[in-house]
């Protein structure tokens, strides 16, 4: 069987829309085009009903009350609304200190940096070498004036799953608002917001086979969590996020989350088998290092460093497969991955990392093709590397004193 190339193995960057999602969206672009805020006629009522049905589907996936779901333009906006909104609301009574992690997505890191510019203080925790955070270190980072903590559920680069329940319990004890970026988690891990001690949680549709440009923020009702709006005008979404709702996008997100809820368990079994097959094949190559914990990890992610190969040249060499080095949002810069550096990986290994992320439409044939392609291209690139030659000769490269020019 011939494999169609290029092969898409970058599902953590974005996913194709599931055909069932696209089909459900189209009528809301053409026939049911009303504004959900139009209360005086049937076009508006139809749109509003569709929006509320989708809200219920999003809530069902994470076991929340539909009234706790606020529509946004995506997880980046949700992160901004949650962190800035909660910090601004609670800082007068609590203080201006924020705790987060060095391996968070830039949408969290840069939001916290912006608050620092406005007079807040922030602590950026360093994770353990496996990517997980030490709970004692987290607890020690909290202060009497800590207003908010933000820890992602699933890391976008290395796929590790943090112990959100334990972290949330520590926050509850200390009266700290707890925000979780769950953009990479929906449809991959079970989320139960009735049980999890989480106050705010960000979601994205396009990481879960839904459309781009739509996301949501969970805002807890009991105990009630308050946030200050960041977008003003019209008072939509119970005053938390103004702007005409994009009915077709919202319908798409609802359908994507419905499918995720119904098919997640069986899908994860299949995807984990493919991931393990890929890992087994790539481990036959010498000097490969898996980044991040393999146990506490989502099924679809594999992040591997190939020593003595430069990441960018490797990506150019394997043009038949769509993979990434680092996060899609920051891989335009040639800096080594800040996530891998936070784990203590050397610049060389951080630079030689490739993130493979498998998804709903990946086949076994595509995985086998990828393994063969990687083996052949890495072999060729290493033949060109004087460092690889020295390694084969048994030279300890860490002990070499390199001359500067």
Swiss-Prot record:
<dbReference type="InterPro" id="IPR020578">
    <property type="entry name" value="Aminotrans_V_PyrdxlP_BS"/>
</dbReference>
<protein>
    <recommendedName>
        <fullName>Cysteine desulfurase IscS</fullName>
        <ecNumber>2.8.1.7</ecNumber>
    </recommendedName>
</protein>
<comment type="function">
    <text>Master enzyme that delivers sulfur to a number of partners involved in Fe-S cluster assembly, tRNA modification or cofactor biosynthesis. Catalyzes the removal of elemental sulfur atoms from cysteine to produce alanine. Functions as a sulfur delivery protein for Fe-S cluster synthesis onto IscU, an Fe-S scaffold assembly protein, as well as other S acceptor proteins.</text>
</comment>
<dbReference type="Pfam" id="PF00266">
    <property type="entry name" value="Aminotran_5"/>
</dbReference>
<comment type="subunit">
    <text>Homodimer. Forms a heterotetramer with IscU, interacts with other sulfur acceptors.</text>
</comment>
<dbReference type="InterPro" id="IPR000192">
    <property type="entry name" value="Aminotrans_V_dom"/>
</dbReference>
<dbReference type="GO" id="GO:0044571">
    <property type="term" value="P:[2Fe-2S] cluster assembly"/>
</dbReference>
<keyword id="KW-0963">Cytoplasm</keyword>
<comment type="pathway">
    <text>Cofactor biosynthesis; iron-sulfur cluster biosynthesis.</text>
</comment>
<keyword id="KW-0411">Iron-sulfur</keyword>
<dbReference type="GO" id="GO:0030170">
    <property type="term" value="F:pyridoxal phosphate binding"/>
</dbReference>
<feature type="binding site">
    <location>
        <position position="156"/>
    </location>
    <ligand>
        <name>pyridoxal 5'-phosphate</name>
    </ligand>
</feature>
<dbReference type="InterPro" id="IPR010240">
    <property type="entry name" value="Cys_deSase_IscS"/>
</dbReference>
<dbReference type="GO" id="GO:0051537">
    <property type="term" value="F:2 iron, 2 sulfur cluster binding"/>
</dbReference>
<comment type="similarity">
    <text>Belongs to the class-V pyridoxal-phosphate-dependent aminotransferase family. NifS/IscS subfamily.</text>
</comment>
<keyword id="KW-0479">Metal-binding</keyword>
<keyword id="KW-0408">Iron</keyword>
<keyword id="KW-0001">2Fe-2S</keyword>
<dbReference type="GO" id="GO:0046872">
    <property type="term" value="F:metal ion binding"/>
</dbReference>
<feature type="binding site">
    <location>
        <begin position="204"/>
        <end position="206"/>
    </location>
    <ligand>
        <name>pyridoxal 5'-phosphate</name>
    </ligand>
</feature>
<keyword id="KW-0663">Pyridoxal phosphate</keyword>
<feature type="binding site" description="via persulfide group">
    <location>
        <position position="329"/>
    </location>
    <ligand>
        <name>[2Fe-2S] cluster</name>
    </ligand>
</feature>
<feature type="modified residue" description="N6-(pyridoxal phosphate)lysine">
    <location>
        <position position="207"/>
    </location>
</feature>
<dbReference type="InterPro" id="IPR015424">
    <property type="entry name" value="PyrdxlP-dep_Trfase"/>
</dbReference>
<dbReference type="InterPro" id="IPR015421">
    <property type="entry name" value="PyrdxlP-dep_Trfase_major"/>
</dbReference>
<feature type="active site" description="Cysteine persulfide intermediate">
    <location>
        <position position="329"/>
    </location>
</feature>
<dbReference type="GO" id="GO:1990221">
    <property type="term" value="C:L-cysteine desulfurase complex"/>
</dbReference>
<keyword id="KW-0808">Transferase</keyword>
<feature type="binding site">
    <location>
        <position position="184"/>
    </location>
    <ligand>
        <name>pyridoxal 5'-phosphate</name>
    </ligand>
</feature>
<dbReference type="GO" id="GO:0031071">
    <property type="term" value="F:cysteine desulfurase activity"/>
</dbReference>
<dbReference type="InterPro" id="IPR015422">
    <property type="entry name" value="PyrdxlP-dep_Trfase_small"/>
</dbReference>
<feature type="binding site">
    <location>
        <begin position="75"/>
        <end position="76"/>
    </location>
    <ligand>
        <name>pyridoxal 5'-phosphate</name>
    </ligand>
</feature>
<feature type="binding site">
    <location>
        <position position="244"/>
    </location>
    <ligand>
        <name>pyridoxal 5'-phosphate</name>
    </ligand>
</feature>
<dbReference type="InterPro" id="IPR016454">
    <property type="entry name" value="Cysteine_dSase"/>
</dbReference>
């Amino acid at each position: 069987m011939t494999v169609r190339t290029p092969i898409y193995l970058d599902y953590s960057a974005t996913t194709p829309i599931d055909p069932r999602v696209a089909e459900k969206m189209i009528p809301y672009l053409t026939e049911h085009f009303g504004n959900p805020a139009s209360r005086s006629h049937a076009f508006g009522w139809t749109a509003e009903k569709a929006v509320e049905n989708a809200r219920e589907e999003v809530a069902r996936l994470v076991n929340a009350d539909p009234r706790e779901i606020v529509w946004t333009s995506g997880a980046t906006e949700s992160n901004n609304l949650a962190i800035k909104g909660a910090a601004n609301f609670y800082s007068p009574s609590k203080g201006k200190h924020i705790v987060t992690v060095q391996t968070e997505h830039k949408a969290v890191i840069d939001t916290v940096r912006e608050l620092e510019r406005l007079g807040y203080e922030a602590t950026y925790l360093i994770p353990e070498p496996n990517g997980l955070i030490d709970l004692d270190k987290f607890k020690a980072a909290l202060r009497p004036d800590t207003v908010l903590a933000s820890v992602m559920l699933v890391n976008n680069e290395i796929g590790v799953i943090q112990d959100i329940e334990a972290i949330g319990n520590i926050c509850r004890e200390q009266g700290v608002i707890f925000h979780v970026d769950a953009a990479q988690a929906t449809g991959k891990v079970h989320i139960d917001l009735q049980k999890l001690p989480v106050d705010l949680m960000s979601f994205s549709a396009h990481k879960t086979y839904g459309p781009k440009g739509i996301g949501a923020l969970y805002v807890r009702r009991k105990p009630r969590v308050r946030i200050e709006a960041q977008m003003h005008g019209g008072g939509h979404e119970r005053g938390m996020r103004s702007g005409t709702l994009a009915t077709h996008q919202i319908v798409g997100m609802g359908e994507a989350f419905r499918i995720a809820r119904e098919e997640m368990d069986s899908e994860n079994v299949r995807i984990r088998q493919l991931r393990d097959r890929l890992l087994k094949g790539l481990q036959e190559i010498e000097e490969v290092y898996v980044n991040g914990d393999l146990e506490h990890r989502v099924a679809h992610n594999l992040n591997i460093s190939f020593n003595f190969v430069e990441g960018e040249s490797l990506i150019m060499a394997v043009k038949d497969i769509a993979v990434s080095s680092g996060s899609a949002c920051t891989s335009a810069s040639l800096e080594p991955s800040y996530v891998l550096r936070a784990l203590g990986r050397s610049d060389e290994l951080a630079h030689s990392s490739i993130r493979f992320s498998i998804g709903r439409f990946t086949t076994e044939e595509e995985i086998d093709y990828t393994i063969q392609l990687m083996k052949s291209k890495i072999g060729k690139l290493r033949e060109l590397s004087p460092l690889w030659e020295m390694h084969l000769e048994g030279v300890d490269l860490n002990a070499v004193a390199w001359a500067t020019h």
